[in-house]
Amino acid sequence: MQLKQVIIAYKARDSQSKRWAELCAKQLENRNCQVLMGPSGPKDNPYPVFLASASQPIDLAIVLGGDGTVLTSARHLAPAGIPILGVNVGGHLGFLTESVDEFQDTEKVWDRLFEDRYAIQRRMMLQAAVYEGHRTNLEPVTERYLGLNEFCVKPASADRMITSILEMEIDGEVVDQYVGDGLIISTPTGSTGYTVSASGPIMHDGMEAITITPICPMSLSSRPLILPAGSVVSIWPLGDYDLSTKLWMDGVLATSIWPAHRVDIRMADCRAKFIVLRENNSYYQTLREKLLWAGTRVRYTSTQHN
């Protein structure tokens, strides 16, 4: 990999990730690399400025923070095909990041990148758009939204706990009306997030599929569904026209929707690209460690049962 121009985004208002960012920037500049650096957080979005001010194609984005910081980077950088090296500095679980232990010798990391001694993992994303009008003559009313983990459709009210009524179509065919607290439409990457908390299935992150998980449905027959990646999921909010429903992307508010609006969610035409430094990268080891499964209490090797 050539590193002529690099983005470094660090978790906003986190001194540890900022110190790492400054160290990385200094080392890369000493290797004749142009660096664009800035904070990323709920009130800080550096990516439009990064992309607009780049003097040449961006070769890599180094993202220092937790999963939320990495999710933000993926939504902005995936359409441009920019690979992301996420490092868990100041984060929590770190499902999407390299351990900071892999990043201690940063000069060695740069050597590995220059010498192409790494792997690239491509992860499926979802895109959503909102339409209004008659079913046969719908007009778009929003931009395209991207999500790496999931989209969530939930009712919204400042002073009431509202039960939502959501009609769902798959590939133009009405499947069900869900009465409950909302729906989660997830990628395999997102299946270990909000989806698993709502009793949805865990899908291997190397798959391409879409899962739909009802949130606290009032019908016991409302169960999670796993769909082919090429499916189009359409959701119509029904009920009170005075109450809005919110569309969330990776835990961030995308927009408000109302009865007579339709949300179409499908596989995006871009993938999030992640740099993997771990030489023995195991999805199941990640599950054991991050979800604290029984396997984390046993020192396990691949030859243990031989």
Curated annotation (Swiss-Prot):
It is an enzyme of class 2 (transferase). Its cofactor is a divalent metal cation. It is found in: Cytoplasm. The active site is at 67 (proton acceptor). The keyword ATP-binding applies. Keywords: ATP-binding, Cytoplasm, Kinase, NAD, NADP, Nucleotide-binding, Transferase. SUPFAM superfamilies: NAD kinase/diacylglycerol kinase-like (SSF111331). NAD(+) binds at residues 67-68, 149-150, 181, 192-197. One of its GO terms (cellular component) is cytoplasm. Its EC number is 2.7.1.23. Its main location: cytoplasm. The keyword NAD applies. Pfam families: NAD_kinase, NAD_kinase_C. Signal peptide: none annotated. One of its GO terms (biological process) is NAD metabolic process. It comes from the Bacteria. It catalyses: NAD(+) + ATP = ADP + NADP(+) + H(+). GO terms for molecular function: ATP binding; metal ion binding; NAD binding; NAD+ kinase activity. NCBIfam families: PRK02645.1. Belongs to the NAD kinase family. Involved in the regulation of the intracellular balance of NAD and NADP, and is a key enzyme in the biosynthesis of NADP. Catalyzes specifically the phosphorylation on 2'-hydroxyl of the adenosine moiety of NAD to yield NADP. HAMAP family: NAD_kinase. This is NAD kinase 1.
